[in-house]
Amino acid sequence: MPRYGASLRQSCPRSGREQGQDGTAGAPGLLWMGLVLALALALALALALSDSRVLWAPAEAHPLSPQGHPARLHRIVPRLRDVFGWGNLTCPICKGLFTAINLGLKKEPNVARVGSVAIKLCNLLKIAPPAVCQSIVHLFEDDMVEVWRRSVLSPSEACGLLLGSTCGHWDIFSSWNISLPTVPKPPPKPPSPPAPGAPVSRILFLTDLHWDHDYLEGTDPDCADPLCCRRGSGLPPASRPGAGYWGEYSKCDLPLRTLESLLSGLGPAGPFDMVYWTGDIPAHDVWHQTRQDQLRALTTVTALVRKFLGPVPVYPAVGNHESTPVNSFPPPFIEGNHSSRWLYEAMAKAWEPWLPAEALRTLRIGGFYALSPYPGLRLISLNMNFCSRENFWLLINSTDPAGQLQWLVGELQAAEDRGDKVHIIGHIPPGHCLKSWSWNYYRIVARYENTLAAQFFGHTHVDEFEVFYDEETLSRPLAVAFLAPSATTYIGLNPGYRVYQIDGNYSGSSHVVLDHETYILNLTQANIPGAIPHWQLLYRARETYGLPNTLPTAWHNLVYRMRGDMQLFQTFWFLYHKGHPPSEPCGTPCRLATLCAQLSARADSPALCRHLMPDGSLPEAQSLWPRPLFC
């Protein structure tokens, strides 16, 4: 059976060869125009599928060049050049083709023609099985052609993206800056430790639940499709056990019963003062999801959370898998059937019992909101899809989509004026965002370091963090973002959740994180016939890592301790994967790349890792800094 994409926990190479003559009727110019536009669509689909399949990539998978720019497509997917014949696409030919594309799109973009050729390319490049190729092209084609029509990349930008900087400048996501108030920044004031006996709040953190309503015990966990362990996956070979009852260590999501087990078994970890829930409710079957499927997942899992958590307030954030097509989050100026109104309205209805009127108003507009859980604490839920590298709608305009960052500045300034503290929750971590968005966010965090008490994200499915530094020297740790592990097993992990201990609800509270605990379901034990699932404490951060506190400097120091202490790093590596690390060892390049990621809360900023190498060699540190595709 042919295999599509990559094996588990590896990057997904895309390959193929130049398309031969096609018998489709039409002028050669239109044929080539459709072919290259379809190639762009096929590559976008490859990105979407690999984004839904790749949890961890080797350190060498996505290096930065010595200049600090992301690797070009032909470097990220080297086989594309060899088999597709990428070298035959010269710079003049490329610019000529994209000139024809832009002229044609201004006249009459033919979605059906583009989709037909994209399906052929998807099959030719072996991006996915034929049925998946057909389904995902039909799902994406309308939005992708609409985005291309509205954005109309210049030939220089498109060919710079495809062939590298020698052919043109490809940074279509141009630089931009938000405005900060003229109010001077107060002197940095680290939080004081709470007094002995001060109240402590416990916050349950749920992320990346990924419910698969088609999960089926006994099916093939290593099928050819991007998601397995489900109806249609077939039976495994005799040498391989089928999908387990509670989940599987493979490219599989969770049955509803496992989410019910998680929520019903929270008692030993509680009680909880509130819940932060940072999205990704649907499964990774991104090639045939409908809006009805996404809304079903939203309402079903929201009802389940409400059933088991009762009166505990729950504050959600929007994940990248909530929409369909996956990662499709147009800014609010996109209206009509292409807009996200269908999703935001459904979220507002589902979450209305938890959110006040003003929060529901901005949720309906752009998927973000702010509220006050306690006196003195402001919670801000960001729609991180407006920073996403995979949100193709940002090709039209990536400058502060929905005005969200400028709105964030206003919220933080108002909190500073009141003397409040702020928690930020979101799905995609800031270090994984588009460069300009990420750098602006970094600047905002630095400006409001005294006000911003904590940041919480998900998305990567693994257990990590991102340290922020002062912008002047990049040496003083001033904030940390906590990236919690997923509930889903995707890919090859135990199910898990996080609990944060926070300086509690009292006058003068710092509201900072005091410690955190991670709980897992050991699938090896749970899937034994007749076993009762037991959610167990995996570790406590301060105890396990010997941290004096959980302030930014402590996490910075932990990274540099792990640089020289292999045993400590192996502990981190084990916990990073929720107690089920990959069988491949993490050697020195992998270790340094992983540590670099913990220092990189700002995208495309390899200088943050300049001290990781023993000799301080910046080029080497850059080459080890991965930006893998995550779910």
From Swiss-Prot:
It is an enzyme of class 3 (hydrolase). One of its GO terms (biological process) is response to interleukin-1. Changing S510A: Abolishes constitutive secretion and decreases secretion in response to IL1B. No effect on lysosomal targeting. No effect on sphingomyelin phosphodiesterase activity. No effect on endolysosome location. Abolishes phosphorylation by PRKCD. The record marks D253, L254 as: Cleavage. Residues 1-23 are annotated as: Disordered. It catalyses: a sphingomyelin + H2O = phosphocholine + an N-acylsphing-4-enine + H(+); N-(octadecanoyl)-sphing-4-enine-1-phosphocholine + H2O = N-octadecanoylsphing-4-enine + phosphocholine + H(+); 1,2-dihexadecanoyl-sn-glycero-3-phosphocholine + H2O = 1,2-dihexadecanoyl-sn-glycerol + phosphocholine + H(+); a 1,2-diacyl-sn-glycero-3-phosphocholine + H2O = phosphocholine + a 1,2-diacyl-sn-glycerol + H(+). Zn(2+) 1 binds at D208, H210, D280, H461. The keyword Glycoprotein applies. This is Sphingomyelin phosphodiesterase. It comes from Homo sapiens.
